[in-house]
């Protein structure tokens, strides 16, 4: 067992069980399906446009504007007003961005950031922490949320059957432990 695997909050026996299972049947090995990056400003206007420029520069993909679901008078937000920008990355772009984003957080993620389906979310407090990004005074400092969606091969098949509502069995869902092992293997992530 590698030194990386010893830094996980999982018993080493369980880690080796998971790795053996993935070796025996490669279709059980989870994979990163997509990475969603979100910058929420809370207001429309010039600041949101600059956030969109920053997100496009970071990801190499054009962001989508997200609208407010309801009016919140205390914050001066109207229903339907653009308040955030987001990008969904897949494939090689997702992995490349994820490497840089994990560098920004020091390859450390809280265990509580993993949901019951094995997906992971974490925040980056300042976008200038991402390697290769320089501070621009006209933009300021922006925080962002990064969500990693992890699934096993075959998960998409059940989701695309619109006529016959599919059910994904519990045994086919990705567990927290598997997510920890996968991210530790791919990126050297430590869970605290």
UniProtKB/Swiss-Prot annotation:
Residues annotated as transmembrane: none
Pfam families: Ribosomal_L5, Ribosomal_L5_C
One annotated GO biological process: translation
Subunit: Part of the 50S ribosomal subunit; contacts the 5S rRNA and probably tRNA. Forms a bridge to the 30S subunit in the 70S ribosome.
Organism encoding this protein: Aeropyrum pernix (strain ATCC 700893 / DSM 11879 / JCM 9820 / NBRC 100138 / K1)
GO molecular function: rRNA binding; structural constituent of ribosome; tRNA binding
GO CC entries: ribonucleoprotein complex; ribosome
Key words, A-Z: Ribonucleoprotein, Ribosomal protein, RNA-binding, rRNA-binding, tRNA-binding
Protein name: Large ribosomal subunit protein uL5
